[in-house]
Amino acid sequence: MAREKEIEIQTRLGKQRILPSKVIYFPRGIMGFENQHEFTLLKLREDAPFLVLQSIDDARLGLLVADPYSFLSDYQIKVSDAEQKLLRLRNIRQVAVLVTVSIPPGQPDKTALNLSGPILVNHEAKLGLQVPQVEGKYPAQVYVHPQNETKVAAADARHPDDGGAENW
């Protein structure tokens, strides 16, 4: 079997090498960046609960994302039949759910998860889709408070199917 050749991409964090099989195609782009279709997930650190959803074509476009279930065990989203079809979902184990994260400069205690625009990734088909939520149990943003020990430990971030983001 031939070994896959890495590609080099530019990011705000410098050059990164990734495998082409790690590229995720977003047919609709991401809200606010509808013309950007190819992204990859990059780890910041081995033990970090956050990833960067990095544009392949625009070094300046990298969104901080996290697995919401690491912080909210009962987070629920609604996905239409059309969205499931676009993602080519055959079963729930194919999908990873991510949400964008905002950390105000100098205020890590105000870190917030954006729950109104979850990003779904079919890791088998390498397809992604942002699925806006209009109704939900949670407000649009939920603050992550590190001192709150009742939440699942952030270091235990997991994708539902593969045991962790480290397999991306």
Swiss-Prot record:
Record localization: Cytoplasm
Q: Which InterPro entries match?
A: Flagellar_assembly_factor_FliW, Flagellar_assmbl_FliW_dom_sf
Q: Does the keyword Cytoplasm apply?
A: yes
One Gene Ontology term of the biological-process aspect is:
bacterial-type flagellum assembly
SUPFAM superfamilies linked to this entry: BH3618-like (SSF141457)
Write the record's keywords in alphabetical order, separated by commas. Bacterial flagellum biogenesis, Chaperone, Cytoplasm, Translation regulation
The primary site where this protein sits is cytoplasm
Write down any Gene Ontology CC term.
Answer: cytoplasm
| Free-text function comment from the UniProt entry | Acts as an anti-CsrA protein, binds CsrA and prevents it from repressing translation of its target genes, one of which is flagellin. Binds to flagellin and participates in the assembly of the flagellum.
Q: Which HAMAP family match?
A: FliW
Indicate the family of this protein. Belongs to the FliW family.
What is annotated about its quaternary structure and interactions?
Answer: Interacts with translational regulator CsrA and flagellin(s).
Identify this protein by name: Flagellar assembly factor FliW
Higher taxonomy: Bacteria, Pseudomonadati, Thermodesulfobacteriota, Desulfovibrionia, Desulfovibrionales
